[in-house]
Amino acid sequence: DSNPDAGVIYFESESAITKQMVIDRGIDPQRMVMFPVTTVQEFRTQAIKVLDKYLEQNEADRKPIMLCLDSMGMLSTTKEIDDTADGKETRDMTRAQVLKAAFRVLTLKLGRAKVPMVVTNHTYDVVGSMFPTKEMGGGSGLKYAASSIVDLSKKKEKDGTEVIGNIVHCKNHK
């Protein structure tokens, strides 16, 4: 709210956000553009197009923007979609490489444009270690490209047996 000209470019892969939800949370929908994305390649292409258009503007005329990807963990690859359509049961071993390449390019463009980006992702438990740890899905590309990594977890806050809210725990990893 401190900058009424600022906006958010929201890449949405879960089909979980609607315009009404945005309005219900008190967010001006005129300041938010939602792009539905299905694959890593589609996200990469759309994000690069947005950043290229932004960089074409005179720096003094640029309105502040922020990019958001919700959720990286839900993005498929074109190979995975093609394999599924063909009835193949093979795992897509190219996903981590495609993600790493996408964020290698995006990180440079985001830095040049001075545009922050927030990415949500899933975590999983690393099996086989003496002290179990959480790891982000999708390979190491995002881990190395990120300026900050914050793990969020939640548990229900109860009053007796009635759930009255959530307790959110934040752990800064990087």
Residue ranges and their predicted role:
Residues N3-A101:
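Conserved inter-motif catalytic segment of the P-loop NTP-binding fold
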